[in-house]
């Protein structure tokens, strides 16, 4: 018999009416990241943006309790119509959770939009050995730093890797404090990203898929995006040439307009 799972209080942003759209944020972030997109999409859609486990106002995951992506999915499913269909959009770790949401097959999907998904388990399948070693070093080093109590150094390395050198030190202290509170959850996010559900399961995705990548992003996510675009026959692939991994943050108006255009098709 499996152990009972922790019961967490969750928080969401929701607005609008129409076909449901689920927006999933990345690690070290929160639903508020999607406010520019919500403001645009709410005119035509019912937009739901939850704080994922350990972020924003959703409870943290208890220390010492095993965690898997199923624990994220348990919080998401009650937010949506039982039968679907639903548009699902995810960025970074949220893109990974969105993939698993689609793989679980519990609710019909209208479409799946993956913006820089951190599906690191795909890198060996893609033959991207150097990118795999690079991201394993980041994830393992981050976990070791958190375990050793070196939270500030671990977060600086993590944020600077994705946002550019000096990004952590340049960040507003209020935002740094919010990220510090979620520092241990990022370790669990890496664990999910390294867990392989099987390439055949990914290839079996049947809903329309859009993959979006930043042309200035890191090699691991660029490899993942291009591999997904090739592995999924129905996938559409878009590269935003001047963007890095954080394109929903750095290019919010462009991302909002892109989603409105694509989800309305």
Language model regions located:
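Conserved serine/cysteine hydrolase catalytic core
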Residues: 174-230, 236-239
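Conserved alpha/beta-hydrolase catalytic His-Asp/Glu region
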Residues: 148-185
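A catalytic-pocket lid/entrance helix-loop region that shapes and gates access to the active site
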Residues: 118-147
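Conserved acidic catalytic loop of the alpha/beta-hydrolase fold
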Residues: 70-86
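Conserved HGGG/HGGXW glycine-rich cap/lid loop of the alpha/beta-hydrolase fold
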Residues: 8-65
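Glycine-rich His-Gly loop
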Residues: 23-26, 92, 214
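Catalytic histidine-centered segment of alpha/beta-hydrolase-like enzymes
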Residues: 240-256
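Conserved hydrolase catalytic core segment
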Residues: 85-127
């Amino acid at each position: 018999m499996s152990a009972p799972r922790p019961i967490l209080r969750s928080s969401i942003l929701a607005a609008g009416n129409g076909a449901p759209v689920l927006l999933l944020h990345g690690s070290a972030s929160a639903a508020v990241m999607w406010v520019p997109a919500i403001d645009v999409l709410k005119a035509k859609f019912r937009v739901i943006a939850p704080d994922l486990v350990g972020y924003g106002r959703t409870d943290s995951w208890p220390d010492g309790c095993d965690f898997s992506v199923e624990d994220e999915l348990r919080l998401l499913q009650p937010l949506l119509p039982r039968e679907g269909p639903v548009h699902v959009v995810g960025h970074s770790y949220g893109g990974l959770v969105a993939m698993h949401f689609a793989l679980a097959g519990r609710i019909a999907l209208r479409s799946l939009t993956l913006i820089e998904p951190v599906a690191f388990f795909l890198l060996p399948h893609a033959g991207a050995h150097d990118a795999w070693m690079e991201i394993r070093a980041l994830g393992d080093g981050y976990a070791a730093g958190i375990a050793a109590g070196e939270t500030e150094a671990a977060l600086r390395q993590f944020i600077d890797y994705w946002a550019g050198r000096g990004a952590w030190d340049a960040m507003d202290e209020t935002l740094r404090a919010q990220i510090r509170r979620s520092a241990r959850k990022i370790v669990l996010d890496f664990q999910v990203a390294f867990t392989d559900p099987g390439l055949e399961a990914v290839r079996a995705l049947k809903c329309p898929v859009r993959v979006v990548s930043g042309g200035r992003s890191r090699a691991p996510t660029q490899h993942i995006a291009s591999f997904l675009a090739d592995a999924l026959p129905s996938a559409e692939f878009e590269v935003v040439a001047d963007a890095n991994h954080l394109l929903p943050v750095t290019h919010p108006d462009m991302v909002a307009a892109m989603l409105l255009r694509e989800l309305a098709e």
